[in-house]
């Protein structure tokens, strides 16, 4: 029981920051391209309390950890009205891409934090574990949210990029997206997308941080 509590404590901060950055980034991008819905709702903020969803931020992360040893979750849905964007079809891609890119940036920040902890000879294990969890959680959200299935960000990005007729047809999948995703997770098909994307994300942040790694070596 003590170990479970420690591990929950390790993942709590990274999960909270990850979903906060994801939601705030999408709200900011939407405002940048003409949709002020999220801004008007007070969602363009780094205050995590605003983005907490009882199910996605608390219940699901706890349940997934207890069942699998892994943590996954999401924030309260960000209010977006793509029709209010200056160029709805094109700008939707940028708004949806903002969330995963925010998670990649957070993964980089946690990675650099880990490097600095090692360089500072911090002996306490807890902050190192938190930094590792931060990288892991954000790479997972980065990879998962780029999966090309609506209403996930990646699905809406694909709709934005497809020709109009194909985009309209593919958008019809959205009402069934949740059930399709559950099936893909249950049959472990999603791992064939998520794991390679997480690896690519890890390579990207390692390359970006390589000058600092060299200086601290």
Regions from the language model: what does each represent?
Residues 1-217:
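Hydrophobic transmembrane alpha-helices and their immediate loop junctions
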């Amino acid at each position: 029981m003590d170990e479970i509590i420690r591990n929950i404590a390790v993942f709590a901060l990274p999960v909270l920051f990850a979903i906060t950055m994801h939601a705030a980034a999408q709200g900011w991008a939407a405002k940048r391209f003409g949709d002020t819905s999220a801004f008007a709702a007070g969602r363009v903020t780094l205050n995590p309390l605003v983005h907490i969803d009882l199910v996605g931020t608390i219940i699901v992360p706890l349940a997934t950890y207890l069942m699998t040893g892994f943590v996954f979750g999401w924030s309260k849905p960000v209010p977006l009205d793509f029709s209010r964007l200056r160029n709805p079809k094109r700008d939707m891609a940028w708004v949806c891409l903002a969330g995963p890119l925010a998670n990649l940036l957070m993964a980089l920040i946690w990675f650099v934090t880990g490097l600095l902890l090692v360089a500072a000879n911090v002996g306490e294990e807890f902050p190192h574990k938190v930094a590792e969890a931060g990288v892991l959680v954000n790479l997972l959200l980065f990879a998962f949210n780029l999966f090309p299935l609506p209403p996930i960000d990646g699905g809406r990005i694909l709709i934005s990029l497809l020709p109009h007729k194909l985009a309209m047809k593919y958008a019809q999948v959205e009402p069934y997206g949740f059930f399709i995703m559950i099936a893909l997770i249950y049959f472990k098909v999603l791992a064939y997308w998520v794991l390679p994307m997480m690896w690519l994300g890890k390579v990207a942040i390692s390359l970006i941080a390589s000058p600092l790694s060299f200086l601290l070596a």
